[in-house]
Amino acid sequence: MRVRSPLVRAFVFDFDGLILDTEEPVYLSWLEVYQAHGEELPYDRWIEIVGSSTAAFDPRGYLEQRLGRALTQDVLDRRIERRTAMVLAQAILPGVAELAAAAREAGLRVGVASSASSQWVKGHLERLGILDRFDCVRSRDDVAHVKPEPDLYLAVAACLGVDPAETIAIEDSPNGIASAKAAGMWCVAVPNVITGGLDLSHADAVVTTLQGVTPPDLVRKIGLTLWVHENRDPDGRR
């Protein structure tokens, strides 16, 4: 069995709920639809799909089954409009952009692994002006299986040219953590509004925010050593 390296050469970020809080808007947009139809959106089922896909729970299919009829296109379109409006009102979550920039300045490789579509992830990263802070982005369009399977993280590691054992994944959900760990990576969890009440204890460390967190801070959380490029200090300054 391979012994995992204590030397960290790469950070890989989740997207939804970690870089941008899209998870609460998606949940709230469906909650509004359920409430408008006099139905309850089961939270215990909803959390099964956080960080993954609707394979485990399809909110549209479930509601239509409860109602005994299909939702109208107008209802579906208005939900998308509400979700989009709420997502566009969100700012990058605290500390993410700064940590990604500091990691690259320190000579680390930096990537994104998301179960969402490439258009969704890259579109938002570009809109937020931070797409160029990442060396590689991999989405559901690039792999056979999304989280909690390891495919996404393995794909990003291959793209970055790093060993998964030399990589820290930064996640917000149980599905994401399971994916990173299955890929052989270390994992730091940063819970959000939706995942704050979930069990994230299978991560190597849990932090409440990335605000003010530097690359050395992150690796120290799990007792590792940061690989530092020649002529640069651990905080990313030349």
Predicted features along the sequence, with ranges:
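Asp-based, Mg2+/Mn2+-dependent phosphohydrolase catalytic module
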Residues: M1-R9, A101, S118-R238
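A broad detector of the eukaryotic-type serine/threonine protein kinase catalytic domain
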Residues: E81-L88, L108, S139-D142, G161-V162
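Conserved phosphate-coupling serine/threonine residues in phosphotransfer and NTP-handling enzymes
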Residues: S114-A116
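Residue-level marker of alpha-helix boundaries and capping positions
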Residues: D21, Q90, V112, E166-I168
